Amino acid sequence: FGKRIGKDITIQSLRQEYDAVLISIGASTDKKLGIEGEQAEGVISAVSFLRDVGKDKSPDLTGQEVAVIGGGNVSMDAVRTAKRLGAKKVSIVYRRRTADMTALPAEIEGAVAEGIEVLTLKAPSRIETDENGHVSGIYVTPQMISKIKDGRASVCPTGEEDFLIPCQTLIVAIGQDIESEHFAEAGVPVSRGKIMTERYGGFDNIPGVFAGGDCASGPASVIKAIAAAKVVAANIDEYLGFHHIISCDVEIPEPRLSDREPCGRVELTEREACSRVCDFEGVENCMTEAEAKQESHRCLRCDHFGYGIFK
C-alpha cells in the first residue's frame, strides 16, 4: 500500500514475488489540452474539481465566469456543479456538435435547463492570462463539420479569426488517462492512454501479468469495472491451474416469470431548474407510494432466481 510503480517497486519484482499480478489502476489522471497557457492559475481538471467538491473542499466560484472544455458526462457534472457553487455564467466549450457529445441526452438537457451556455464547434487554441498569471479567458477557433472518419463527422477550421471567451476558472474535461510511463518501460503494451491486453486480459510477452478495468478499457462505468474484474479473476484462476466454480450456500430455485405481468416503467419528474441550481439535493422527485409499489412489482428477482452475483 502506498507504493508507486517504477519508483518504489517494479512489475518485474512483483512478478518474482507473486504467481500472478493484476494491474487495475483505473484512469485517474486527466488528458491535457496541450495548448499555450495551460499551466495558468485557475485552470483545473474536472476530476480534481469534482473530487474536491465531494470532499467538501469546494472552491468559491461566486460571481465568476466559468468555462468547461469537453462534451462528456464529466463535463456536464462540472458545469452543473459550478452553477451550484455560485458562478455567474457557466459555458460548455466543445469542438464538435451537440449531437456528437458523448454525454447522456438527459444530462445535456438538464444543463441547458439550468442556464448553462453551450458553445459548440469551438476548438480551444490558447489560454489568456492576466498580469498575475491567472486565467482570464480562452481563445477558441471556429470549426465546421467536415469529412466522415470512422463513422463520425470530423471537424476543420472555418478560417474565421479566433475569439476570446472570458472566464476566471477554466475546467478541463476532455477525458481521463493512465499513468503509463513505468508500465511501458516494463514491457506492458500501452497505446493511446490504455493498457493493451489480449482478449483474456493478459499479455503474451509477460506471462502471469494481467490488467482490467478502466486502465484497459478506457474510462467506463462502475458496473463495467466490476464485470471486468470477474472475467480477469476467472482467467487468473485458470492460468494458475485451477477451475474454481463460485457457488453459494443456498438452494437456487428455477426461474419463474408466469406470475409477472408486463408493466411500464415509472417516469420520475424533476424539480424546477430555478430551484435545484441553488442546492445539491436530488434533481429528480421521489416516487409516490403507489408508484413505488408498482415499480417494485416489476422486479424479476434476479437475486432469488440465480442471476447477478450467483450466476
Predicted regions and their residues:
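FAD-site-proximal beta/loop scaffold in flavoenzymes
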Residues: 39-63, 148-219
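Rossmann-like dinucleotide-binding cores of NAD(P)H-dependent redox enzymes
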Residues: 79-126, 244-259
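Feature captures the FAD/FMN-dependent oxidoreductase FAD-binding
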Residues: 1-35, 126-139, 144-147, 169-171, ...
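N-terminal glycine-rich dinucleotide-binding loop that anchors FAD/FMN and/or NAD(P) in oxidoreductases
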Residues: 1, 38-53, 103-132, 137-143, ...
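A conserved FAD-binding loop/helix module that cradles the flavin
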Residues: 212-246
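Mid-to-C-terminal Rossmann-like scaffold of FAD/NAD(P)H-dependent oxidoreductases
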Residues: 115, 123-129, 134-135, 146, ...
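Glycine/serine-rich phosphate-binding loop and adjoining beta1-alpha1 elements at the start
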Residues: 1-52, 207, 289, 293-311
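Rossmann-like NAD(P)H-binding beta-loop-alpha module
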Residues: 57-87
